[in-house]
Regions:
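The feature captures the beta-strand-to-loop junction immediately N-terminal to the Walker
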Residues: 37-39
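Helix-to-loop junction immediately C-terminal to a conserved catalytic motif
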Residues: 52
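Conserved ABC transporter NBD signature motif
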Residues: 60-68, 77
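Short helical segment in ABC ATPase nucleotide-binding domains corresponding to the A-loop/adjacent helical element
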Residues: 97-106, 116
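Conserved ABC ATPase "signature" region
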Residues: 113-131
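Conserved ABC ATPase signature
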Residues: 136-140, 144
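Conserved catalytic motifs of ABC-family nucleotide-binding domains
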Residues: 157
Length: 161
């Protein structure tokens, strides 16, 4: 049996009179992919913020990586979650390589050779050339920056992305 990575049970969230989420229930199991598509303001980001513990539902329950988000140690939970920021998520003063290996380095992984190998593996995984590792974010297109953001999120080997 596969682990449930995301579970929302009858989740509702309002901002004033605007209901961003209305009785949403969903289950995403380990190994599954979910794409949430909708117009601006329809609740996509609100749902992600709830999964990451950045916002609480007005009603219902949210589970991520097997934990009740409302009861979880959020720092510990967030270490299991890779998050790609939509806009301007890269550090402009760091090379692509340093952006990718940022989380492993601050978590104690200091072996430069191993970090370079990880960066090379992940840059290839997102479809970019190794030569990009020595560039700075401003030298990349918006789409390339998004891919680097995905590589950085994967660098910590999260259970949930």
């Amino acid at each position: 049996m596969r682990m449930e990575m995301i579970r929302l049970e009858h989740v509702t969230k309002s901002f004033g009179r605007y209901k961003a989420l209305d009785d949403v229930s969903i289950v995403v199991e380990e190994g599954e992919f979910l794409t949430v598509i909708g117009r601006s303001g329809c609740g996509k980001t609100t749902m992600l913020r709830m999964i990451n513990g950045l916002q609480k539902p007005d009603s219902g329950k949210v589970y991520a990586a097997g934990e009740d988000v409302g009861e979880a140690d959020l720092i510990r939970l967030r270490r299991k979650i890779g998050y790609v920021i939509q806009n301007k998520g890269l550090f402009p003063h760091m090379t692509v390589e340093k952006n990718i290996i940022y989380v492993p380095v601050i978590s104690g992984q200091k072996d430069k050779r191993q970090n370079r190998k990880l960066a090379e593996e992940l840059i290839g995984l997102v479809g970019l050339e190794r030569e990009m590792l020595d560039r700075y974010p401003e030298e990349l297109s918006g789409g390339q920056q998004q891919r680097v953001g995905i590589a950085r999120a994967l660098a910590s080997r999260p259970k949930l992305l």
